[in-house]
Design a protein with these regions (language model features):
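Soluble N-terminal domains of membrane-associated systems
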Residues: 1-62
């Protein structure tokens, strides 16, 4: 899974909340986290494996 696929999956999974603020805050949090980790020379694949399924993350947020 790529960074963009992860972020879009997270956004889609959170969309059922109809809370745009919650969606935006979490989208930006994970986008920033991924960028920070990439800047530490970690691979996108490694970061995505660490984060796991965006649907499970969304479920824990809701």
């Amino acid at each position: 899974m790529s960074k963009n696929e992860f972020l879009e999956g997270l956004k889609k999974a959170l969309s059922s909340t109809n809370d745009q603020r919650l969606i935006n805050e979490n989208y930006e949090f994970y986008r920033n986290y991924i960028e920070e980790e990439l800047n530490k020379q970690r691979s996108e694949e490694e970061i995505m494996q660490e984060l796991g399924d965006p649907r499970l993350i969304a479920h824990s947020i809701r």
